[in-house]
Amino acid sequence: MQVKERCFGMSENKFIKRILVWPNITFYKDLTQDSFVQTIHRMIVELKKIRDDIYWDLILPDKSEVVYIFSYENVNIHRIPWPSFIQSTRGHFDTSQIDEITKYGNWNFEDIDLIFSHLPESTWNLVNHLGNRWHHIPPILTYSHWFDFSTICNWKYPAFMRECEGVSLSEKCYVNTESQKQLVLSEAKEYFSEQFVDKLNSKIEPFHLPVLDNEVQNDINTNTEKIIVFNHRTKVYKDFNNIVNKVLDPLWEKRKDFKVWIPLLDIQTISNSWKHRDYIDNTKYDKNGYYKQLKKCRVGISPKQKYAGWSVATTDGMMNGCPFIMYDADYYKELYPNGDFFGDYDSAVTLLEKYLDDESYRNKEGKKSLEYVKNSLTWGVKSSKLSHDITNIIDNTKSYDTNKKGYIKLVEDIKNKTMTKKEVISRRWGSSIKFTPYRKALMDDERISYYKNKENWVYEYKGKK
């Protein structure tokens, strides 16, 4: 996807900050529904509302259906072949593809100010390859959506140690919850020294994934149907089988006046082993239809998790006015501390019956959880933190001494002629000298702007301080 014709950042005389995003694809068959794609799209949209000095170089699998959602003048998509098998992505790193998208030898891509890695397993590969190829080693911000905990993984070679290595190379690493951070630190003690675990502790912090302000409903639907929603993944780590066998089946035995909507339950499972469960509905909708159906539901259920992650399924319901009963655990209390919690399966059955029978209570809880989302869980509330962290990490990059002759000569050359990165580098020093401190000094120099013209990113002299 090409940058639009007009020159990005030129008219504002800004020094544009560039962020290279490394992906973590887990839903290859429909990238529009992939959690990473949705998350980075939200970040781009929300940051664009509060600042106009960021340009995103976004790496995505070579599929066309997601390009349209990133049609912004400050985004460029670089599409490369990508494994469809999740475990293969853990070790996937094609240096020839990286060289192609970074235009190695063309000098048109290398002024990156921050690497935003969503796959910490690949971070060492990135800094090793790009650091040796480039004159420039930018700092790293990581967002880990997943860790290969031993209590979850049933494959032979989990990537937990490589994930921790990637975190250690970052300036900061976001995880979904404080509970998840504690799981990482606890398991890391089995493999690493106390000093290394302390390093992880200093770098990892929770980033509670917000919802889009414009997708939050103004009010609840007070005329709901007797539908219980389980909109989580139907996996063991989401306690799915126990929820069905120990909560939903017993509830159906007691009363047959409700349905359970499980949109992520696949048709193969339904047809082969679920025919006797007449209460199950696995109808799938597009995004608008999904939200519309959530508004009709009486209550949702959020299960025990082995992963202690943030539950987007729960916030999806809450922002549409559907209250959720939640397993009594810290990771749900981080999400919504004022909800109804169950400590065992019998308690879950009791709570579900209360919501099915007492619509007035249900509506009160739905309104409470909706108001909590509006006040605490929207991007309007959270985007300033992300913006601050990006600025802080870039600002803390070491800068070159602007009083030295090398920098003074560099500025004089830019003053005499607007220069591309190739021109800046090729006439000045060899490959052993890194460009990073010079890039930072130019960024901090109010006389210099950096923008995208029709063909290249260029440095331009704008006058005295």
What are these model-derived regions, one by one?
Residues 292-309, 322:
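Acidic donor-binding loop of glycosyltransferase active sites
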Residues 1-65, 73, 249-253, 427-431:
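N-terminal subdomain of nucleotide-sugar transferases
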Residues 166-201:
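A short, active-site helix/loop in glycosyltransferases that binds the activated sugar's phosphate group
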Residues 117-123:
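Short His-centered aromatic/hydrophobic patch
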Residues 39, 212-215, 223-274, 281, ...:
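Conserved catalytic-core segment of nucleotide-activated headgroup transferases in glycan assembly
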